[in-house]
Amino acid sequence: MVKQLKFSEDARQAMLRGVDQLANAVKVTIGPKGRNVVLDKEFTAPLITNDGVTIAKEIELEDPYENMGAKLVQEVANKTNEIAGDGTTTATVLAQAMIQEGLKNVTSGANPVGLRQGIDKAVKVAVEALHENSQKVENKNEIAQVGAISAADEEIGRYISEAMEKVGNDGVITIEESNGLNTELEVVEGMQFDRGYQSPYMVTDSDKMVAELERPYFLVTDKKISSFQDILPLLEQVVQSNRPILIVADEVEGDALTNIVLNRMRGTFTAVAVKAPGFGDRRKAMLEDLAILTGAQVITDDLGLDLKDASIDMLGTASKVEVTKDNTTVVDGDGDENSIDARVSQLKSQIEETESDFDREKLQERLAKLAGGVAVIKVGAASETELKERKLRIEDALNSTRAAVEEGIVAGGGTALVNVYQKVSEIEAEGDIETGVNIVLKALTAPVRQIAENAGLEGSVIVERLKNAEPGVGFNAATNEWVNMLEEGIVDPTKVTRSALQHAASVAAMFLTTEAVVASIPEKNNDQPNMGGMPGMM
């Protein structure tokens, strides 16, 4: 592959063209009067969206230098989405503003390293000021407001608020496509795992084909149970207590399964057997989660425990268990609260440390099952195109709401960034460092300016009035009114605003300190000469 190089001003200007192309496509979506962007999909219907990171990921430019510039801004959107889950359009607008202003100064002779120091200094002060202005999210109504602003839909905000209220802030909220027109919320309380009863003869309700156990005992083991004699001493103790038992094992088979079913049908005792969830190491971890939730002890060779020696005090308990053909749901396990809290803290640490998206998702599911439950928002729409667009908006709104619960909220509509303008302007600096601070100062007004322009207004006029307004007072572009943003529920999560600013500044600083760009130039394939026709061939 042939490489081509560009240096200094040539390199930066070529990359800037790419930055502008991507940012201009993304920034039309910002604000309540932002527009949509249509993305061509090769094998499906076009996707209509206003989600910044989704648009950014689709952009691939022909010129390799311009494409590198676009990829840098794409990285801003990706990183912001990864950390905060929303605010990708704001981050893109901030990055473009810093890069454009910074490049003017570099072209005029400013030292990029000095500019970088100034940018870093200004962003640090701005982030501190954002946290000072931040307010905690304290009630269901405020959670609904955050979701509604992000999705531009009050109904979506309400669904997310209800879901978080029912499953807790650490609970899993999943978004699925519905077959109908309406969007619905479905909540599964307690721990649910995707394993059902091993025999339909174990059901307690033959109409619903469900086994419902009240105040059951739990036998949790990673062993295969083939012989009924292995568990008979334990079952005799359970029968004396006149309570049902749920057996969670690697497999219940042969003589053991037959006798459990026969005794169930005779009415001797009620026992339901289910396979242990997960596979390999994940199975062991999930069995430990279940044991901690119910107060059971895992019967495993790792601890030198055998089924024949198991006693009733090694079993867990819960207020209720429901077992269907496919799922088992445990409600209100009787495990020790301190042990559950310790397990939750351990899972949170593992989530922070893991670098695998798949592992993170599985750990979050386990955390939710221990901490609260699972809520499913089933998205409905009239067409597939609308369904995809609506699903993306709900995903952003959910991420935004989680971020708000974590770090609080600030005034929305770009107001929070202008509110820290004064603090940043008070930074004492000289020369190129001062210029770097000024680059950030100008960028802080860019989101408000763009929101106003998308609403068909003059951005500069709105920005100047906002600089002189009381903190928290901002411009509501949806109604063209000046209001107290927090009181009106026009809010942004502090984490989203902070992440957008930090990632935009990071990429802008790297861009400005770039002096050479190396691009791969695809080699042109020379057309092969046509082969002569063979005798007898057409």
From Swiss-Prot:
GO MF annotation terms: ATP binding; ATP-dependent protein folding chaperone; isomerase activity; unfolded protein binding
Localization per Swiss-Prot or TrEMBL: Cytoplasm
E.C. code: 5.6.1.7
PROSITE patterns: CHAPERONINS_CPN60
ATP-binding is among the record's keywords: yes
Keyword Chaperone: yes
NCBIfam families, sorted: GroEL, PRK00013.1, PRK12849.1, PRK12850.1, PRK12851.1
CDD domains: GroEL
Family that this chain belongs to: Belongs to the chaperonin (HSP60) family.
Reactions listed under catalytic activity: ATP + H2O + a folded polypeptide = ADP + phosphate + an unfolded polypeptide
Main localization category: cytoplasm
Annotated positions binding ATP: T29, I30, G31, P32, D86, G87, T88, T89, T90, G413, N476, A477, A478, D492
InterPro entries in UniProt: Chaperonin_Cpn60_CS, Cpn60/GroEL, Cpn60/GroEL/TCP-1, GroEL-like_apical_dom_sf, GROEL-like_equatorial_sf, TCP-1-like_intermed_sf
Full protein name: Chaperonin GroEL
Organism annotation: Staphylococcus aureus (strain NCTC 8325 / PS 47)
Complex and partners: Forms a cylinder of 14 subunits composed of two heptameric rings stacked back-to-back. Interacts with the co-chaperonin GroES.
GO biological process: chaperone cofactor-dependent protein refolding; protein refolding; response to heat
Pfam families (alphabetical): Cpn60_TCP1
